[in-house]
Amino acid sequence: MSSSSIHSLTGAPPVASAALAAHGKRITSIDALRGLVMCIMMMDHVRETLYLHHQVGDPMDISHTPPFLFFTRLAAHFCAPIFVFLTGLGAWLYANPPGAPPRSAREFLLKRGALLIFLEIFVMSFLWVGQWPEKVWLQVLWVIGFSMIVLAFASGLPRKVLLVAGLLIVGTHNLFTSIALPPDHPMHALWTLFMHRDVLFDTVPQVRVTYPAWPWVGVIFLGWCAGPIFARGFDSARRRKLLVLMGAGCWLALLVLRGFNIYGENTPWTHWPTTVQTVMDFLNYTKYPPSLDFLLMAVGGGCFVLAAIDQADNAFTRFMSTFGGAPMFYYLLHLAVLITGYKLLLAVFGPNQVSSSGVERFGVGPDQFWIVWVVTVLMWFVLYYPTKWFGGFKRRTTIGWVKYF
């Protein structure tokens, strides 16, 4: 287990190496889950590289989204909520090292949160398109960074207060997400940052918010509150039982709320001509911002996986832990490889697809969508050894800034 395996996207710091090592396989399960969702995330990014000419909506349009595309996109829905949940969990582990008094996580959260926002604005937008973009998108790194900054100031509150706050935020934000304020409204900028996906600054470059922050703050609070069950000395059987109960509670609430179209998703599901389409509609949730149903599905699934791999040590957990142990390096590297590969393919073969907006791109057609899955698996193995090397280098080095990656 590396000293920084939980720091970059999740919030455990490099200085906590002794603390994290003492948690042993429990922390390995966290790394493995993070690595798993990052591998799934790559599949979605490969899709966006090779199949961007076929845009998917939010929520998706069932009548124009074939099942292979729907379920590929649906799998990626688990990634961001689990990232943010593990961010809070990792921050709690830092603040409560085993065998030592509790310590403040404020400075750690502030520094890493600010770094993630910086990377989102000045690095990620470039990596997505391979040039300085006309639009800057505030996406997952921005919202993780912002949530970390909020948690930095809230982490001194009693855990019960954060638990209630997290539940209230996650449970009630759906009441307000359909409200859109016009650009000339004095509260438009704040509303866009926190609640509604929109243009933040209509400048050059234009700044757009993809991930409104408010519901994600609730998720990071809940992750922090889950931290104690991963403390050293916590009975592993009891931890697995609690994780299963948490996952079952999330999915049971989802089945009731979604099944009866009570609350939690602004778009109700209906019966379609085929069973597959009906299932797709039932699972068709809003991501930007995440609906309550979206979060229940993803966080509940994450709890089940954590329970299943708790204290596991096998080829699967070791493979996934490699990616989860150096998450920022892996994240930046996979985007750099994808955009470089795309530019080469475009230069060699030229554009062969046209989007609905008339933009010509290189890509694969519906009959070749399997290439997206094959490229994803190949990318896992291409990036495995560089990520493993960097994880080892990060553990050995005394260079301070390397620990942030």
Task: Name the predicted role of every residue range.
Residues S2-F405:
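Alpha-helical transmembrane segments and their immediate juxtamembrane cytosolic regions
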